[in-house]
């Protein structure tokens, strides 16, 4: 079994809560952009943003994986970037992960209203290789990509 550790160096464990989720069935490209949008925000603000993404009210800017994507209304005013999407599936899993880290912080006795995301990262997970039969005895690959996400929140004054 391979070993795993957080890519964030923990300093003061008493004021920090962390959570991780493995093998999320979301493309790493979508997950990376959603993670970048909530990095550095308060947990309550991040949850509100993700709920708006799920309801298709607010898009997330796509800065790296932006090929052939359209401009979305309201993005330049808030993010100074016109290109974006609504990664609903990634937002659902991130919202669940935020609830987990909030519960971990509550178990440590931290105040849920003062939590700030100090570290969040998405890593490439396992790729499930499947094949779809085609005509004349051929087959087409269908790859299911997964992601791993880790999050660390800190209580600020």
Curated annotation (Swiss-Prot):
Top-level taxon of origin: Archaea
SUPFAM superfamilies noted in UniProt: Ribosomal protein L22
PROSITE patterns named in the record: RIBOSOMAL_L22
GO molecular function: rRNA binding; structural constituent of ribosome
InterPro entries attached to this UniProt entry: Ribosomal_uL22, Ribosomal_uL22_CS, Ribosomal_uL22_euk/arc, Ribosomal_uL22_sf
Keywords: Ribonucleoprotein, Ribosomal protein, RNA-binding, rRNA-binding
Pfam families: Ribosomal_L22
Gene Ontology CC annotations of this record: cytosolic large ribosomal subunit
Entry-linked NCBIfam families: PRK04223.1, uL22_arch_euk
Record text on subunit structure and interactions: Part of the 50S ribosomal subunit.
Function: This protein binds specifically to 23S rRNA. It makes multiple contacts with different domains of the 23S rRNA in the assembled 50S subunit and ribosome.
Name of the molecule in the record: Large ribosomal subunit protein uL22
Lineage: Archaea, Thermoproteota, Thermoprotei, Desulfurococcales, Desulfurococcaceae
């Amino acid at each position: 079994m391979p070993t795993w550790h957080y890519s964030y160096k923990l300093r003061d464990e008493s004021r920090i809560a962390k959570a991780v989720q493995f093998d999320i069935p979301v493309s790493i490209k979508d997950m990376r952009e959603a993670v970048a949008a909530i990095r550095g925000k308060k947990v309550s603000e991040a949850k509100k943003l993700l709920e708006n993404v799920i309801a298709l009210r607010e898009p997330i800017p796509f800065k790296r994986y932006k090929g052939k994507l359209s401009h979305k209304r309201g993005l330049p005013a808030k993010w100074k970037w016109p290109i974006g999407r609504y990664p609903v599936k990634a937002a659902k899993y991130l919202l669940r992960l935020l609830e987990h880290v909030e519960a971990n912080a509550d178990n440590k006795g931290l105040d849920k209203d003062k939590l700030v995301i100090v570290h969040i990262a998405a890593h490439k997970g396992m790729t499930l290789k499947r094949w779809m039969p085609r005509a004349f005895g051929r087959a087409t690959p269908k790859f299911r990509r997964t992601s791993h996400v880790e999050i660390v929140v800190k209580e600020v004054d």
